[in-house]
Amino acid sequence: MTRYRSFETERLLLIPTSEDDAAFMLKLLNSPTWIRYIGDRNVHSVEEAAAYIRSKVTAQLERLGYANYTVIRKTDQEKLGVCGLYDREGLEGIDIGFAFLPEHEKKGYALEAALEIKRAGIEEFGITQMKAITVKDNVASQRLLEKLGLKFSKLVELPNDPEELLLYELKVDDEAAHAKHTYIHPESIT
């Protein structure tokens, strides 16, 4: 089995989301804030959550070496939310995104996790153009994106989604992105 990178911050572990996280993902995907701001994914059982992880997370992880990370609090190993780098259909470039269970919002976890994922995306995965999308009424997400250094660019629509979304962008200097670390895809190591 290929081993993918995990990350760590002062309070958090960021581990690639796997089928072991299916029960947690079921809860997150059906939380009121996920439904309101991201949308109903029609995942209603642990089995459907495992299938969602296989098709949306594992497939991208195998293809690119990064995807969705389950955010775990170090002190008690509780799963708080997710943060990741996504290759979304209809969006050129890599999208940084995050979602937390309502009881773990407004505690700085999303910013802490997203700063580390942003750093890893730039320094370890060589991402030179990072984007983010959010709905117009998700002001908390917009503020967090601005704290990450992303700037509002324009309104966009994604395929199969009639809602206009706010697009935020961050262009990374190519030299800075590759100067500190060169990422080697796990499958290229023999």
Spell out what each predicted region is.
Residues 57-70:
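A short helix-loop-beta-strand connector motif used in the catalytic cores of GNAT acetyltransferases and
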Residues 35-55:
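Conserved GNAT-fold acetyl-CoA-binding loop/helix
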Residues 1-36, 68-190:
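Acyl-donor (CoA/ACP) binding surface of acyl/acetyltransferases
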Residues 55, 59, 159-160:
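Polar/charged alpha-helical tracts
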Residues 29, 38, 60-62:
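Hydrophobic residues in alpha-helical segments
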